[in-house]
């Protein structure tokens, strides 16, 4: 098992993790979170991919909208918060693009000439 999703609140995290070893909670909503192995969040995954391909942090872009995306946004050179992201994510991002519903990733990539249409 790599990940378990649970409906819970922050006040319940300690109780949920009681009796577990080498696990952490990464929340993506006020009432939901993922239980994952310790040191296996999105930021660590991004760092592993960058190291594998010999890329620098500045060569990477990440998009996110939930609390569980914050460490990923901080692990790359340009962290982009979706327009529908929670305020905490927007505050930690370098840039804010349009919402998911407005195809924010597509429009950001088009504006930055990362893709052509």
Residue ranges and their predicted role:
Residues 75, 83-117:
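Asp-based, Mg2+/Mn2+-dependent phosphohydrolase catalytic module
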Residues 61-63, 80, 97:
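Hydrophobic/aromatic beta-strand patches that form the interior of the parallel beta-sheet core
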Residues 1-75, 84:
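Conserved acidic, metal-coordinating active-site core of Asp-based
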């Amino acid at each position: 098992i790599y990940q378990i999703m649970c409906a819970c609140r922050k006040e319940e995290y300690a109780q949920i993790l009681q009796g577990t070893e080498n696990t952490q909670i990464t929340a993506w909503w006020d009432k939901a979170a993922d239980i994952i192995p310790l040191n296996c969040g999105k930021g660590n995954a991004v760092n592993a991919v960058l190291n594998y391909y010999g890329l620098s942090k500045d060569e990477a872009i990440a998009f996110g909208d939930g609390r569980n995306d914050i460490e990923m946004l901080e692990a790359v050179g340009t962290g982009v918060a979706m327009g529908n992201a929670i305020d905490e994510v927007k505050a930690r991002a370098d840039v804010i693009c349009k919402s998911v519903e407005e195809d924010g990733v597509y429009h950001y990539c088009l504006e930055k000439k990362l893709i052509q249409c």
